[in-house]
Curated annotation (Swiss-Prot):
Keywords on record: Ribonucleoprotein, Ribosomal protein, RNA-binding, rRNA-binding
Listed name of the protein: Small ribosomal subunit protein uS3
Protein's job: Binds the lower part of the 30S subunit head. Binds mRNA in the 70S ribosome, positioning it for translation.
InterPro entries from the UniProt entry: KH_dom, KH_dom-like_a/b, KH_dom_type_2, KH_sf_prok-type, Ribosomal_S3_C_sf, Ribosomal_uS3_bac-typ, Ribosomal_uS3_C, Ribosomal_uS3_CS
Quaternary data: Part of the 30S ribosomal subunit. Forms a tight complex with proteins S10 and S14.
The family this protein is said to belong to: Belongs to the universal ribosomal protein uS3 family.
Molecular function GO labels: mRNA binding; rRNA binding; structural constituent of ribosome
One GO process term, biological-process aspect: translation
Organism for this UniProt entry: Fusobacterium nucleatum subsp. nucleatum (strain ATCC 25586 / DSM 15643 / BCRC 10681 / CIP 101130 / JCM 8532 / KCTC 2640 / LMG 13131 / VPI 4355)
The encoding gene: rpsC
Lineage summary: Bacteria, Fusobacteriati, Fusobacteriota, Fusobacteriia, Fusobacteriales
């Protein structure tokens, strides 16, 4: 029986790059890894409202960390005259005890980002909008983007308060999960309702890419 895997991890080194870019010996590896997790959790928890899709981390030296934030609302993170981003940098330096540089990259196509689409569906469901309506509207908006070739959405849980949990999905366009050169964006989100938690999964196909055009440059 086939096993389902995260399409992003399956394509690492082929069409996608790693979100953490650094090298370390055995003694420092665990320390750096946990530090990366702390940084990402801190940013996503405190700046969730800014529509954060991804946080990439680079280490130029043992005492310097570069944090790249991909967000749909860059202005909220930067703030007036850079006040917010300066405050964020100070908090991260206190958290890590190292010199931190924060770089913000705004996502231009919000409907082409799987994380933002999944979180949008979850937010609508939590506002008591019917899950089918939220799902079909998200698919319709995404397919209007010229960068999106196909999208698949699956929602699982006690749909409409049913006693038995089930899954429903919808797909439009082409989503070739078995093609490794296919640029597949994938995300998972959770909607908390009065009947329990609903899981939302989103796959977005951006077309086939060559290894020389890997996402994010070098891994």
């Amino acid at each position: 029986m086939g096993q389902k895997v995260d399409p992003r991890g399956l394509r690492l080194g082929i069409t996608r790059a790693w979100d953490s870019n650094w090298y370390a010996d055995k003694k420092e590896y665990v320390k750096y890894f946990h530090e990366d997790v702390q940084i990402k959790e801190f940013i996503k928890k405190n700046y969730f409202h800014t529509g954060i899709s991804k946080v990439r981390i680079e280490r130029t030296s043992p005492s310097q960390v570069v944090v790249h934030i991909h967000t749909g609302k860059a202005g909220l993170i930067i703030g007036r005259k850079g006040a917010e981003i300066d405050a964020l940098r100070a908090k991260l330096e206190k958290l890590t005890g190292k010199k931190v540089t924060v770089k913000v990259q705004e996502i231009k196509d919000l409907n082409g980002d799987a994380v933002l689409v999944a979180e949008s569906i979850a937010a609508q469901i939590e506002k008591r909008i019917a899950y089918k309506k939220a799902m079909t509207q998200a698919i319709s908006r995404s397919m209007k983007s010229p960068e999106v070739k196909g999208i698949k959405v699956m929602i699982s849980g006690r749909l409409n308060g049913a006693e038995i949990a089930r899954s429903e999905w919808a797909v439009e366009g082409k989503v070739p999960l078995h093609t490794l050169r296919a640029d597949i964006d994938y995300a998972v989100a959770t909607a908390h309702t009065t009947y329990g938690a609903l899981g939302i999964k989103v796959w977005i196909f951006h077309g086939e890419v060559l290894p020389s055009k890997k996402e994010g440059g070098e891994a």
